[in-house]
Amino acid sequence: VVEAGAGRGTLARAVVAAGPRCLEAGTYLMVERSAVLRADQPSGIGFASSAHIPDGGITGVVVANELLDNLPFGLLAADGDRWRSVRVGLEADQLVEVLAEERLPPVDIAPVPGARIPDQGSAAAWTTGALESLDLGALLVVDYTSTTTEMATRPVDQWLRTYRDHQQGGRPVDDPGSQDITVEVAVDQLPEPTSTTDQSTFLVVHGIDDLVAEGRQTWTEQATIGDLAAVRGRSRIVEAG
């Protein structure tokens, strides 16, 4: 398993602790650019860490869990019969949005007055590179998704969002560096996937109901003890919603 954007290895710890058969003779490679975050990742048998995804030769699965929505993207605005790039300018010591050069949209979509769309070339390039790194296996992407056409019909602040201290922030140009900027992923701008599904269906197909039932039984039997197994059982129930 190769996890891109693994951070401190929270997901890696959970996956390895579950003891999946696919890792009995394999390794969980945590890919994280930040040296600070890599320093907090788990180590030992079953774990490996790197700043980069291997160029090729991977047999297994590459996982991107809420990675693509954080990659750099462009923003296009409809202006008459064309699309134009949205840039950032300075006006009276304030950062403002400025319509700049004409741009071709990433997919074939007509400009409609007031419409805006993302240009997610970085996400498309990352996905292509991840697929090319696989000799045998699959790429699993988990993210908030939409389509370019669908986003063009919605207010931009519904799919281009900012967060500060785990709460929704202000405009993307407000207080640079103080808030995270995230965007829904337009799946029609990525290489065509083999299949897509929503998170609920994916979890049910892969046995979430059985795992929750097992956790509920563990919690019922060991709640009075309050040991780690009991806490894990309760966590399954709570996190499954």
Could you say what each language-model-derived stretch is?
Residues 104-241:
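Long, Lys/Arg- and hydrophobic-enriched amphipathic alpha-helices
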Residues 6, 67, 142-146:
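Short, well-ordered beta-to-alpha junction loops that form the rim of enzyme active sites
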Residues 61-112, 153-164:
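A mobile, often basic/glycine-rich helix-loop segment
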Residues 38, 71-72, 149:
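Conserved protein kinase catalytic core
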Residues 1-58:
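SAM cofactor-binding core of SAM-dependent methyltransferases
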Residues 59-60, 137:
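Conserved acidic residues
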Residues 5, 62, 190:
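A residue-level signal for conserved active-site and pocket-lining positions in enzyme catalytic cores
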Residues 5, 32, 65-66, 214:
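Glycine-rich, histidine-containing beta strand-loop boundary motifs that form or position
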